[in-house]
Curated annotation (Swiss-Prot):
Protein name: 4-hydroxy-3-methylbut-2-en-1-yl diphosphate synthase (flavodoxin)
Organism this protein belongs to: Vibrio vulnificus (strain YJ016)
Cofactor(s) of this protein: [4Fe-4S] cluster
Gene: ispG
Reported function: Converts 2C-methyl-D-erythritol 2,4-cyclodiphosphate (ME-2,4cPP) into 1-hydroxy-2-methyl-2-(E)-butenyl 4-diphosphate.
MF annotations from Gene Ontology: 4 iron, 4 sulfur cluster binding; 4-hydroxy-3-methylbut-2-en-1-yl diphosphate synthase activity (ferredoxin); 4-hydroxy-3-methylbut-2-enyl-diphosphate synthase activity (flavodoxin); iron ion binding
Alphabetical list of Pfam families matching this protein: GcpE
This enzyme's EC code(s): 1.17.7.3
Pathway: Isoprenoid biosynthesis; isopentenyl diphosphate biosynthesis via DXP pathway; isopentenyl diphosphate from 1-deoxy-D-xylulose 5-phosphate: step 5/6
Catalytic activity: (2E)-4-hydroxy-3-methylbut-2-enyl diphosphate + oxidized [flavodoxin] + H2O + 2 H(+) = 2-C-methyl-D-erythritol 2,4-cyclic diphosphate + reduced [flavodoxin]
Homology family: Belongs to the IspG family.
């Protein structure tokens, strides 16, 4: 029930990764990347489907060898979500996966080779209507840029990106997006800010190699939050040393926090104190686990006492304000006559949330696909 985001997004051009629009005001797409052996087709397909189930719009798959390219062909046949092939070193792998229906090619300027090889990839992408991501990374800059700047700097990352933007411009290819990732928050943020002033293409955001599930989520939230709040970013990937499913959850949580794009329930819950009339923490944990399948955007406040409980409930779709033995229940900001037994809050509130979701959105789906 909170207002729309006040953020004014940067204007950018539009490309499509499969049927998912990127840029020009399209919903910010949330991506992840498989961490299975690509040659293990069954495991990779299973992970892609798990990512799709938690809301991934696009999935990137590493294709390091020709054997992996042949496996990619089989993987693509078994999934419906758009796939990006992550290509390093050997441009011929990009040409091969293009034959197998890849939806986007990610190439790294630091290791893909000379302009002639890039031309071969671009010509193939143009013929098959495949977009490209120029993916610059602070850990793999070209050697001459390492020598010139001494260390990764925003200017170095952006110069690397612009070299390849210029190549694509000369080849009259405009179906691309760009990323300038770094593991340092300020380096990444300053690089994206600088790049955003130079080009109109969509920007893919990420803090690369951010760390484990907790630290990586915090680092990504800080860095990407700064950029998104400034309107920079058209698609994102949270890089965690964790189950890729967590990357999607964190990505949506960041977008949800900024009211840019909502998926599922936004739980507003107090950290609890001695005033709580029920166990807030266990209640929230249980509901989060039970209701992962609900993707209809909804604010649900769960507050353990009457200090802030009524106020939060009045601006939520559903709300609970703790009281002795039975807690007050709110819907659409209005207190209901019905009260919930504090010993059975999880079951009662789950039923109310599911019923509310069904009324708000019968299909319980969010469609990122928008019209031109």
């Amino acid at each position: 029930m909170h207002n729309e985001s006040p953020i004014i997004r940067r204007k950018s051009t539009r490309i499509y990764v499969g049927d998912v629009p990127i840029g020009d005001g399209a919903p910010i797409a949330v991506q992840s990347m498989t961490n299975t052996r690509t040659t293990d087709v069954a495991a990779t397909v299973a992970q892609i489907k798990a990512l799709e189930n938690v809301g991934a719009d696009i999935v990137r798959v590493s294709v390091p060898t020709m054997d992996a390219a042949e496996a990619f062909k089989l993987i693509k046949q078994q999934v419906s979500i758009p796939l990006v092939a992550d290509i390093h070193f050997d441009y011929r792998i990009a040409l091969k996966v293009a034959e197998y229906g890849v939806d986007c090619l990610r190439i790294n300027p630091g290791n893909i080779g000379n302009e002639e090889r890039i031309r071969s990839v671009v010509d193939c992408a143009r013929d098959k209507n495949i977009p490209i991501r120029i993916g610059v990374n602070g850990g793999s800059l070209e050697k001459d840029l390492q020598m010139k700047y001494g260390e990764p700097t925003p200017e170095a990352l952006v110069e690397s990106a612009m070299r390849h933007v210029d190549i694509l411009d000369r080849l009259n290819f405009d179906q691309f997006k760009v990323s300038v990732k770094a593991s340092d928050v300020f380096l990444a943020v300053d690089s994206y800010r600088l790049l955003a002033k130079k080009i109109d293409q969509p920007l893919h955001l990420g803090i690369t190699e951010a760390g484990g599930a907790r630290a990586g989520a915090v680092k990504s939230a800080v860095g990407l939050g700064m950029l998104l709040a400034e309107g920079i970013g058209d698609t994102l990937r949270i890089s965690l040393a964790a189950n890729p499913v967590e990357e999607i959850k964190v990505g949506f949580d960041i977008l949800k926090s900024l009211r840019i794009r909502s998926r599922g329930i936004n739980f507003i819950a107090c950290p609890s104190c001695s005033r709580q009339e029920f166990d807030v923490i266990s209640t929230v944990n249980a509901l989060e686990e039970r209701l992962e399948d609900i993707i209809t955007p909804m604010d649900v406040s769960i507050i353990g006492c009457v200090v802030n409980g009524p106020g939060e409930a009045e601006v939520s779709h559903l709300g609970l304000a703790g009281s002795n033995k039975k807690s007050a229940f709110y819907e659409d900001g209005k207190r209901q006559k019905e009260r919930f037994d504090n010993e059975d809050l999880v079951n009662q509130l789950e039923a109310k949330i599911r019923a509310k979701a069904a009324r708000m959105d019968e299909s319980n789906r969010i469609d990122i696909k928008v019209q031109n």
